[in-house]
Amino acid sequence: VDDVLANTPLFSALDAHGAEALRSSLSEMKVSKGQELFHEGEPGEHLYLVLDGKVKLGHGAPDGRESLMAVLGPGEMFGELSLFDPGLRASTATALTDAIVLALGNDQLMPLLEGRPAVAAALLQALARRLRRTNEAMADLVFSDVPGRVAKALMELGEKFGTLTP
């Protein structure tokens, strides 16, 4: 647990006292494969951190199709937009495997951000990385054909979750 947390943007920017305060505010959730953590269109009140397993973020179309936005593994955050924008969830989070996630409510994080600009900066950096990936995906939609986009997605998943075999 501590190894995963130490490598997340939220924890890496905290001193020992702040990290302990944040750790005590987290709620552990065990989710089964296929279980939704939240659904697109619901109000967002928590950010989540994958501790074990894999979670996908998807966006549904009116005709029932789903666009895969991200596959997340241990140490990755999601749902953090709800901390800064009280709007509705823009995606559905579903466990791809049995997973353990940590949840942090908006009301628990905001006091930790006050007086800790390094934590706020780490969150902004995580959001900026996500925006950069979104911009790249938009460019791919415009400039790449379907086989090219599928190949790129498979390569990215392989780099992120694959293991090298001789």
Language model features with spans:
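Glycine- and acidic-residue-biased ligand/ion/polar-headgroup-sensing regions
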Residues: 34, 45-58, 73-75
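Cyclic nucleotide-binding regulatory module and flanking cytosolic helices
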Residues: 1-33, 82-83, 115
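Polybasic "coupling" helices that flank or enter modular domains
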Residues: 96, 114-166
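Well-ordered beta-strand positions
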Residues: 30, 48-49, 94
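Cyclic-nucleotide recognition modules
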Residues: 19, 70-132
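A residue-level structural signature of the nucleotidyltransferase/glycosyltransferase Rossmann-like core
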Residues: 3, 47, 69, 101-102
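Short alpha-helix-to-loop micro-motif enriched in aromatics/charged/Gly
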Residues: 62-67
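Short phosphate-coordinating micro-motif centered on Lys-Gly-acidic
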Residues: 37-42
